[in-house]
Design a protein with these regions (language model features):
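Short, positively charged, low-complexity/disordered linker segments
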Residues: 34-49, 100-116
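Residues that cap or initiate secondary-structure elements
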Residues: 26-28, 82-84, 93, 103-105, ...
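Long, contiguous N-terminal structural blocks used for assembly/anchoring
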Residues: 1-65
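Short, intrinsically disordered low-complexity segments
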Residues: 43-99
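Acidic, proline/glycine-rich low-complexity IDRs
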Residues: 1, 102, 107-153
């Protein structure tokens, strides 16, 4: 698919971001994801326990956060070159990331995201979906392993 089509179907600016979901996850899936991003990407993680920024996510702190019902604030930014993927550690039942579509300027940017999504899908052995913000039912892309499906409007 060409960049112009991708821009108009996925990365258009409507005032909202795009969400990335891996649904029906558990703590093991999250640990797999944390190990993947810690090994492959530049990270900026806010450790809510120490109130410090760190370059690696400490999964034991995330598990503690979940046990304390979210009393610690914790987010992470994963950098795919110039693209920032934000991660929210709400609970272990789904992995949720979000992206700002305005950061996507080229087919290369799209391909960087696709590479990340494929790695996540393969590592967790689960489907990854990209949706409109807060709309998991409105799927823009599905990734299963190396298979990428763009849902045309």
């Amino acid at each position: 698919m060409d960049w112009k089509t991708l821009k108009s179907q996925i990365y258009f600016w409507d005032g909202s971001w795009r969400d990335i979901y891996v649904q029906n996850t558990d703590s093991e899936d999250w640990e797999t994801w944390v190990n993947l991003v810690n090994d492959k990407y530049k990270i900026n993680w806010h450790n809510g326990k120490t109130n410090q920024s760190e370059t690696k996510i400490k999964f034991d702190v995330i598990k503690e956060y979940w046990k304390e019902n979210g009393e610690l604030c914790s987010t992470a930014n994963i950098f795919l070159d110039k693209i920032q993927v934000n991660t929210h550690f709400f609970d272990d039942s789904e992995i949720e990331n979000d992206i700002d579509p305005r950061e996507f300027k080229s087919l290369d940017d799209h391909n960087r995201l696709i590479e990340y999504l494929k790695l996540v899908s393969m590592a967790c052995n689960k489907e990854v979906i990209v949706t409109l913000e807060n709309s998991p039912e409105y799927v823009l892309m599905k990734i299963n392993g190396n298979e990428v499906q763009i849902i045309e409007a």
